[in-house]
Swiss-Prot record:
ATP binds at G126, T127, N128, G129, K130, T131, T132. The gene is murD. GO terms for cellular component: cytoplasm. The keyword Cytoplasm applies. Keywords: ATP-binding, Cell cycle, Cell division, Cell shape, Cell wall biogenesis/degradation, Cytoplasm, Ligase, Nucleotide-binding, Peptidoglycan synthesis. One of its GO terms (molecular function) is UDP-N-acetylmuramoylalanine-D-glutamate ligase activity. This is UDP-N-acetylmuramoylalanine--D-glutamate ligase. Belongs to the MurCDEF family. It catalyses: UDP-N-acetyl-alpha-D-muramoyl-L-alanine + D-glutamate + ATP = UDP-N-acetyl-alpha-D-muramoyl-L-alanyl-D-glutamate + ADP + phosphate + H(+). GO terms for biological process: cell division; cell wall organization; peptidoglycan biosynthetic process; regulation of cell shape.
Amino acid sequence: MSAAEPALAPLSPGAPVLVAGGGITGRAVLAALRRFGAAPTLCDDDPATLRGYVDSGVDTVSTSAAAERISRYALVVTSPGFAPTAPLPLAAAAAGVPVWGDVELAWRLDVAGHYGPPRRWLVVTGTNGKTTTTSMLHAMLTAAGRRSLLCGNIGSPVLDVLDQPAELLAVELSSFQLHWAPSLRPEGGAVLNIAEDHLDWHGTLADYAAAKARVLDGRVAVVGLDDSRAAALLSTARAPVRVGFRLGEPAAGELGVRGGQLVDRAFADDLTLLPVDSIPVPGPVGVLDALAAAALARCVDVPASPIAEAIVSFRVGRHRAEVVAVADGITYVDDSKATNPHAAEASVLAYPRVVWIAGGLLKGASVDAEVARMASWLVGAVLIGRDRREVAEALSRHAPDVPVVHVVTGEDAGMDATPVVFGANVTKVKHLGGDLGAAVMSAAVAAARDLAKPGDTVLLAPAGASFDQFAGYADRGEAFAAAVRAAIR
């Protein structure tokens, strides 16, 4: 371990370390630092959170006070929610105090042998499809009899699983986590796609893409070639092995589709993996997710048979293109996890005729190009949430014949006073102290049912975050499912 010690500097036994954020990530960081022998102090903006840690014997401080005394600490380990422009990271940078994320800490401790023989990390990132792809990858590794752990932005933090025996880690990472993990060098890393998202955190699309590209600095870089922004990252990847995947026929060094089969020409001359029609995730997005997962599995020598076995038995996660009901010839699909325009477009394109329930918080992203590409799939739209006007304006430009209904509430960020655009229908929701999200979704589903005909799909694929009207994307999806069940009863 002594040879690996420099990788841990400035972390050392007894070193004062500031842990920024007291959520799930913060708890995992505290446990790891205590195990290592460091002297952690936790900061958070929520007094109730701090009181809970004080009761557990943890030294605590407010975030503002921590920023004022930042030079007392040898290191800051931050939760991914802290943007680099937040006062605390800025104070650390000005004082020359390094800032790591929890993934950076996990990577350095693992490489240093702190948890035994280092694992081989297989990392998935991208604007959309991360969770499905990582879950597929883990299933492939498990089907091959390999000891794999699923972690990161899905399930448990990486730090929470490192004390479990494993050869491989199937890791989903967000752009926030990757920004704070500059030394990460995985065995294999995949960038599925790049679209406008989290620009309020990163500042620019270039900075967002640069964070995603960090997974390409290990041994094998895997990139979705059908996405121009992602494909552009392959030429600058540091990985010595570079692999692309596409929906079309693969060239040498790629995975793709030929004759209705997924084919590997990167890790074999010409290896058939599985039939496209065995992939349970609908539409092109399901094929792309399976190709990316297969590429990472193949980079650690998983044969074709367990890859096919894993896909055939794979089940889509909750709120990810989940069919919640079929009634009167209309299919109701919950894709509440489609929290940005790129994801919503992929979801809409999986079905031939769609009544689209959309809206929420766009986080600075434009929806115009995506609406233009999906316009011919839409037979109706029901718009909810704070940023629904932007969606409505895109629909008026690119799908002017598609009927649009606005669901308006008094609590909807003052949107009652906003002029209704282009003569759209309006459903007003009166919120009398009950569940606002449930009321909104009940009205949205009722409007969508009125627009839908047999053979249509009523699709919740919002293109925005949910926090204006819901506790999270899962809460939004549950509200949709409950509203559908009530409507078809």
